[in-house]
Amino acid sequence: MTRNYLHKKILIFGMGLTGISCLNFFLSKGIYPKIMDTDKRPKHIEKIIKFKNICYHTGSVNYSWILQSNLIIVSPGITPSHPALKFATKKNIEIIGDIELFVQETKVPIIAITGSNGKSSVTKIVKEIIQKAGFTTYIGGNIGIPALNIVNKFAHFFILELSSFQLERTFSLKAYIATILNITPDHLNRYSSDIKEYEKAKQKIYKNSKICIINVDNPVTINRQAQLTKCISFGVHSGDYHLSHTYTNTWLCYKSLKLINTKKLKLSGRHNYINMLSALAIVHELKISFKISVRILKNFLGLPHRCQKVYKNNNITWINDSKSTNIASTKSAIQSINTKGKIRLILGGDKKSSNLNLLKPILKNNAIVIYCYGKDKKELFNLYPHKSKIFETLQEVMQHISVQVQPGDVVLLSPACSSLDQFSGFEERGNTFVKLIQELIH
């Protein structure tokens, strides 16, 4: 049900893309909120300055504005432990996020997707299949398109990719289909190294959902919110959707029905197959035929920065997996590689309080040579000092590798860490990797 904000004193906290989308949302209703950011010169400040009637504050927290407000819209990047939010909570001021605004505003059925890894890929696959079936759909949320940018569009379905940060401040979501693809340790710097808090945030996606899609290999993805919700499962060896193996072939299956041989897919790697199974589970609940779904899967090339083969020459393959910002994702990337040469693995960045020792089993592989850089380079180096090298920057790593690499090798950027110590995001890190290949190798 659409909420009336006319008598609310609204403060938007954060001037990123999400904050701007919230501002535009309220302006479209004739409401003029205040907006603030602790950065002195936020990236999108010019978009705010152009509105003459908007009060904005930068460089610090405006506590008097907080006291004057009775509704705060907070951007997902601002942690619950932020002093401003703690202050507002003590004053009993309502705090919500942009996704809460979105779900209160729309009556369009929502497909909600979360997970530590694979969210964007599954979101994109589901979108392509739904569109191929003749439905109108839009994606938004954590995928880089603020949800409020699509809220007024005509659609049969909205597909929301949701992070734990977004789910924290969402209370009214009633998804038609909800899924947690997987949960592995991530963002523990935000959750005080308590994975239970991370799991709790993810689990909110299931509340009041009609259909939940669960990963049977990852028990923490199982719906704890309601016993009566229809549940569909996927997994490697079991689940409604699963993989079936013979000596030479692997199939994506629905129960006893073989849907597609993985040899016919453009993507390889078990993590990609599992993502596809979850997407199949979602769209089949929309009564979309497997024939349509399989056609899309055959041609799906994946997304940039996700195990993306960016260059191959002289039998040397360069893979950009910059999106791997946690241990589980990096492990999946390594497992997907089949080579007779060396795997030259680039690790580095901010570990986000992760236990890097969890990488040790997969790094035992004698074919792996490790290159460490960035904020937590020393801890990464100490995992296997005898086969690791340490550098300050990604550029230094690439300069060294360009001299050492041999035919048959795979160079894999899969950092297992956040990029924010040296880059604006995983995209900039991945683009820098590609640019350095062009400069050093071409």
UniProtKB/Swiss-Prot annotation:
SUPFAM superfamilies found in the cross-reference section: MurCD N-terminal domain (SSF51984), MurD-like peptide ligases, catalytic domain (SSF53623), MurD-like peptide ligases, peptide-binding domain (SSF53244)
Subcellular locations according to the entry: Cytoplasm
Superkingdom: Bacteria
InterPro entries assigned: Mur-like_cat_sf, Mur_ligase_C, Mur_ligase_C_dom_sf, Mur_ligase_cen, MurD
GO CC list: cytoplasm
Function: Cell wall formation. Catalyzes the addition of glutamate to the nucleotide precursor UDP-N-acetylmuramoyl-L-alanine (UMA).
Protein family membership: Belongs to the MurCDEF family.
This protein's name: UDP-N-acetylmuramoylalanine--D-glutamate ligase
Name of the coding gene: murD
